[in-house]
Amino acid sequence: ILGYKAPKLISYSYVLLDGDKMSTSAGTVVLVTDFMKAVKNTLINEFNKRNSEISVDKLNILVNACIKFTMLNVSKNKIVNFNLENATSFVGESGMYILYSLVRINSILKNNNIELTEEIKFNNEIENKLVKELSLFPEVIDELLTSNEPAHLTKYIFGIAGLFSKFYEQVNISNEVDVVLKSSRIRLLKSTAKVLTNALS
């Protein structure tokens, strides 16, 4: 129609909420509005624990992100068991963990806005691992398009976020006196942010 290709439907298995099936006869049906409200309230509690504030608009975006990531992170041939606590956690294999990693990267870049050198060098193994993993992004996208398995992408970006977490623990950027090394690390974080942003788009 109108020159556009018809979208390809990818069917998924059942979705369980914390391991339970929904049943009208048993009165266990959960409305979408109630489900999203539960996710929102859980996120609010998470932010309150951290004494952090968030706007309503951003909160709604995070609600959708938590649900989407959790659903897509399961193979289409498997039952999706939606665990509210895991889906909204800032740690572990969740959308919030990925987004938190991206926020942290952008914060580092904002605080280290320097002129970058042409020369590139690294001196830490975790840097090389991150470079190698980032280079696989085009292959992951090709595999996703071939297999119609979004979980390939979610698993990949979770791995990227995990490598960044190790990078964050082992590597210092702000206090680095070697200009070339500092510049190289900033370039690496910019590339990491770009891959994560594109993958989440």
Feature annotation, model-predicted:
Residues 1-201:
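Non-catalytic interaction-recognition regions
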